[in-house]
Each structure stands twice: as C-alpha cells, then as structure tokens.
C-alpha cells in the first residue's frame, strides 16, 4: 500500500508544483519529495521480499538501485535548484515536475517484477528525460530532445520485442520466469 501512496504523492507533488507560481513553494516540495523518496527506500528495505500491487517486488537488485537513487536525489535536487536560479518560474517548475516524474518512474522500474511493467516505466523515464532536455525551449534543445526520444524509444521497443519473442519460444509457462 505504501507504493501506491508513493506514486499518488508524486502525482500530487507534480500538480502542486504546476499550479504554484512560487519558487520557494517548489523548493519546499522538492525537499519534501527527496525525504519521501528516502523514506520509501527505507520502507522497501524493511519489507524485502514483499510484493505490492502484484507487479512490484522489493528484491535485492531493485533495492540496491533504489538506495543509490535515494542517495543521488538530494544532490540532484540541490543542483537543479542552483541550475535554474535565473530561469523564469514556468521553466523552473517544468524542470522540477520532470525531475519528480523521472525519479518516480526510475523507482518504479527498479522494483518492477514484470517485464511489461518494466518496459512501461523505462519508456516513461525516456519521456521524463525528454521534458528535462527541452525545459529551456530552445531550437538546440528541441533537436536534442527528438533525437533522444527517437533513439531511446527504438532501443526500448526492440528490447521489448526480444522479450516477446523469448516468451513465444519458451511458451506461456516459462514466460512468467522472464519477469
């Protein structure tokens, strides 16, 4: 149930930042999100081996990646605030909404126990990074964004196609073991 709360809280934070026209409010929400992510990682560690929402499990490799992400969240959020100091409030908020989305999607991908769910979250991270690349809205950023989305989406789609072929080769019983 805590995983669902984490996902819903991330959505609420994004909506609140979108509606906020205040830089200090956005900074406060980003600090709160960082603490929430660290708390979620601790919760996941305390519930090792538990499956939530059918498609997410707190296992060793996923927890390791989740903790690394939690360690990186604080300096990334701090740097994002410094990097966007001179940006207008709209760009400042778009950057931080995209950052929350990216961290949330990465967390979901790390703990996913189903290949389709993993693929969905991996593709979602691509879109969140695209928003981070294009938050300045320049011509160079637009070119970089569409190239990034094209290359990543094709690569992720081909990887998922390979997973589907493996599931057809090994049959339905062994397809569950691919997850």
Model-derived segments and their meaning:
Residues 94-101, 105-179:
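Alpha-helical multi-pass transmembrane bundles of energy-transducing inner-membrane proteins
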């Amino acid at each position: 149930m805590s995983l669902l709360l984490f996902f819903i809280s991330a959505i609420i934070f994004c909506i609140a930042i979108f509606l906020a026209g205040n830089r200090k409010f956005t900074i406060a929400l980003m600090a709160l999100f960082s603490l929430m992510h660290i708390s979620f990682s601790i919760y996941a560690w305390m519930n090792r081996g538990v499956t939530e929402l059918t498609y997410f499990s707190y296992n060793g490799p996923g927890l390791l990646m989740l903790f690394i992400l939690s360690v990186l969240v604080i300096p990334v959020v701090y740097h994002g605030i410094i990097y966007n100091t001179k940006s207008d409030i709209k760009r400042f908020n778009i950057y931080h909404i995209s950052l929350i989305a990216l961290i949330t999607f990465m967390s979901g991908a790390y703990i996913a126990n189903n290949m389709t769910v993993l693929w969905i979250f991996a593709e979602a991270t691509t879109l969140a990074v695209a928003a981070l690349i294009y938050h300045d809205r320049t011509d160079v950023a637009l070119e970089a964004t569409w190239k990034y989305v094209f290359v990543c989406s094709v690569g992720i789609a081909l990887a998922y196609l390979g997973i589907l072929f493996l599931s057809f080769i090994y049959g339905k019983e062994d397809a569950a073991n691919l997850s």
